[in-house]
From Swiss-Prot:
Transmembrane segments: none annotated. May act as a double-stranded DNA (dsDNA) mimic. Probably regulates the activity of a dsDNA-binding protein. It comes from Yersinia pestis. It comes from the Bacteria. Pfam families: DUF440. This is Putative double-stranded DNA mimic protein YPO2187/y2032/YP_1985.
């Protein structure tokens, strides 16, 4: 993989959010979708992190933080606070030539 051919942080967030919106209808309860849509403007967000350790339990490849990012999408108690109602955790490859993502959905 090429360090010079990675998505920027903003591109990573945007791509993860687009994937979330595309797949949410098939993976979240209708009540959660309604809540997310009603509250996202005021309390919603997407935050970028290095991949958490527990991803190794869900995928069978090496998660190099230089090439993978975790995007947490959900709602916070109020604007500016950390997301505490997580609707999806998206593991995304940041290398532009390797389209790979894995999502852990709210249960």
């Amino acid at each position: 993989m090429d360090l010079n051919n990675r998505l920027t942080e903003d591109e990573t967030l945007e791509q993860a959010y687009d994937i979330f919106l595309e797949l949410a209808g098939d993976n979240l309860d209708p009540a959660d979708i309604l809540l997310f849509n009603l509250q996202f403007e005021e309390r919603g967000g997407a935050e970028l992190f290095d991949p958490a350790e527990d991803w190794q339990e869900h995928v069978d490849f090496d998660i190099n933080p230089d090439f993978f990012a975790e995007v947490v999408i959900g709602l916070a108690d109020s604007d500016g606070e950390e997301i505490n109602d997580i609707f999806a955790r998206v593991l995304l490859c940041r290398e532009k030539d390797h389209k790979l993502c894995h999502i852990l959905w709210k249960e």
